[in-house]
Amino acid sequence: MVGEYVRLTPAGKGRLKGLCPFHKEKTPSFQVDTEKGYYHCFGCKASGDVFGFVQQMEHLSFGDALRKLADRAGIQIDAKYGEKVSRDLYEVNAFALDYFRSHLPGPALDYLRGRGLSDETIAAFELGYAPDGWDGLLKLARTKGVSEKQLLEAGLLTENPENGRVYDRFRGRVMFPIRDHLGRLVGFGGRVLDDSKPKYLNTPETAAFKKGELLYGLDKARSGLGGGAELVVVEGYMDVISMHQHGFTGAVASLGTALTAEHAQLLERLGAQSIVLMFDQDGAGLKATLAGLDQVIGAKFRVRATSVPSGKDPADALLAGDDAGIREALAGGLDEVKYRVQAATEKYGVDTNEGKRRVLMELLPRMQNLDPLDAIAQDMRGAACELLGIRPEALLDWITSKAKRRTLTDTHLAGMSQSSGEEEHELALLRQLLVDPSLLAKLDGSLPWRNEAVRKVMLAAQGARSPDDILDIFRGQPEEQLLIRLMFEGRDSGSLSRASSQEYEQKVTTYAAHAVDDIQVTLNIDALKTEVDLLKKQLLSTPPAEQLALLSQIQELQRAIEAEKRARRGS
C-alpha cells in the first residue's frame, strides 16, 4: 500500500526504505516494516500503521481511511463505519461508465474537442456518451447479468409511474462520471449536445449519491491539500475540466447547488486551508456566492470570492485563451467582508438614503452576531460604518434594538451618521432654534439643508412659538428623539451662569440669537465653498477657451466667501 505513494527499496530483512512523504529530505529516512505493518520516519518522527498512513497521506478520517482500504481489498465493511451502500452499486456504476465511454466516438467527442479539451484530458476525466435511445443500457445489462433493480438503485433507470415500464435515465448526453473524495464512482452528470432542456441531468439521490455532499473533481483536486493548495469552487463540470487542463488543478464544482454546510465540513476534514468561490457574474452567480459564504461561516479555512473579469465562465474564458484572466481573478479574490460590501454597494448604490438603507439591511444578517470571537461580523460592522459614514456606537445600538425590524427612515440614518461639517453646522443651528423658535425668522430661506431631519423640522417649525410646539409636531415620530437631545444640549451651554432662573433664560436666549447669526454665516460660507469645489472639478474637463469664464466665477465666489468672513468678524 505504501509503495503506491513512496518509491521503496530494500533496507534489510522485512524492511523497505524511501524518501519520507511527510517532509522534504534528500536522504531516505522513511522505513516500512513489512512483517509488522508499521512505518516510521527517523527524520520527522511520523509513524503508524497502514490506516494512519492513509489518513495522513489522504487527509482522511479513520472511517474514510477504513472504507478506502476496504474498497481496495474488496471487503464490505460494517455499516457503523459509514453509510450502508451495497458494494455492487459502485460496480453497477462502473458497468455503466464502460458503456458510456464505449459510445463516445462521434458527435460527443467532436463536441468535447470543440470545447477545447484534449484527448488526454477527456480520458483522464473518463468522459463518455449516453446514446439517444430508450433502452440501450438496459438491454446490455440484461446480457451481462445486471438486474433492473440494481440499475434503479443506482439511478440509471427511470420508471414510468403509469405503466411501470423502465427506460434509460440518460439519453443523448455527454456523460461526466462523478466520484466522491475517496474516488468511488457514485453517479453521473449528463449534458445535452444541443440547447434542449434540461441542459444538465444528474443521478437522483441514491444511497451513494448525495448531491449536497459531493464536489465534482475533488478526488483529483484533493491531492494538493496537504501542501496548502487553494481549492477553487466553480459552477460546472466543463469549468472544472478546463481549469485542470490549463494547470488550475484545485478546481472543483458543486452539483447544481450552492456550497453547503456539508461541503464545508468535508473540506475542513480534508485539511483545506483556503478556498475561492469563482462563480459567474450574473444574478444567479452572485446569489450562489452569497449563499456559499453563508454556509462556510465559522469554517477554519480562509474563504475568498471572485469572478472572471471578462464576464465569461472559466471554461469559455480558457477556450478564448484568457488564462491570464483566470489568474487575475484568483489573485484578486475578495475576502468575505469586502465581497459582501461590494456586492451590496453595486446592487443598491450609496448615493441616496434609499440605497444606504438597502445596503445596511443587506449586510445586517452577517453583522448582527455580537460574539467577540466572530471576527468577520466585527469587520463587517467596521466596513459598514466606513462605507455609510455611520458611528460605530450608533450602529451597535440599532443592531441590538427593535428598530432594525422596521424600515429604516431618513432620520434613523441621520441619527446614526457621522455628520459632515455642513451637517454639524445645521444641527448646531437647530439646537439653538429649539431654545427660541422665534429666531427662525432670522434665517435665510434659501439655505439648502443637507441633513434630512433638519430639513423636515425647519419646514414644519414655521410659526412655532416654543420648543414644545415643535416637539408636539414630531411626537411619536423618529425625529422626536433627535429634537429632545438637541433641546437639552442647547440649554446646557456650560458657559452660562445659572445665578437665577430668569437671568439664565435671558442669557440662553441671547446666546442662541448670537449663535444663530454666526452659524448662518458659516452655512453661507459652506454653500459658497461647495460651489467653488464644483466649479474647480468642472474646470478640469473644460476646453481652454472656456476656462476663463469659470475662473472668473470662482474668483467672484471666493470674494463672497471673504466678505462673509469679514462680516462674521465684525459682528
UniProtKB/Swiss-Prot annotation:
InterPro entries: DNA_primase_core_N_sf, DNA_primase_DnaG, DNA_primase_Znf_CHC2, DnaG_bac, DNAG_N, DnaG_primase, TOPRIM_DnaG_bac, TOPRIM_dom. Transmembrane segments: none annotated. Mg(2+) 2 binds at D280, D282. Residues 229-309 form the Toprim domain. Mg(2+) 1 binds at E235, D280. Its cofactor is Zn(2+); Mg(2+). GO terms for cellular component: cytoplasm; DNA-directed RNA polymerase complex; primosome complex. It catalyses: ssDNA + n NTP = ssDNA/pppN(pN)n-1 hybrid + (n-1) diphosphate. Its EC number is 2.7.7.101. Binds 1 zinc ion per monomer. Binds two Mg(2+) per subunit. GO terms for molecular function: DNA binding; DNA-directed RNA polymerase activity; zinc ion binding. A zinc finger (CHC2-type) spans 20-44. It is an enzyme of class 2 (transferase). GO terms for biological process: DNA replication, synthesis of primer. Keywords: DNA replication, DNA-binding, DNA-directed RNA polymerase, Magnesium, Metal-binding, Nucleotidyltransferase, Primosome, Transcription, Transferase, Zinc, Zinc-finger. Monomer. Interacts with DnaB. Belongs to the DnaG primase family. Contains an N-terminal zinc-binding domain, a central core domain that contains the primase activity, and a C-terminal DnaB-binding domain. RNA polymerase that catalyzes the synthesis of short RNA molecules used as primers for DNA polymerase during DNA replication. This is DNA primase. It comes from Deinococcus radiodurans (strain ATCC 13939 / DSM 20539 / JCM 16871 / CCUG 27074 / LMG 4051 / NBRC 15346 / NCIMB 9279 / VKM B-1422 / R1). The lineage of its organism: Bacteria, Thermotogati, Deinococcota, Deinococci, Deinococcales.
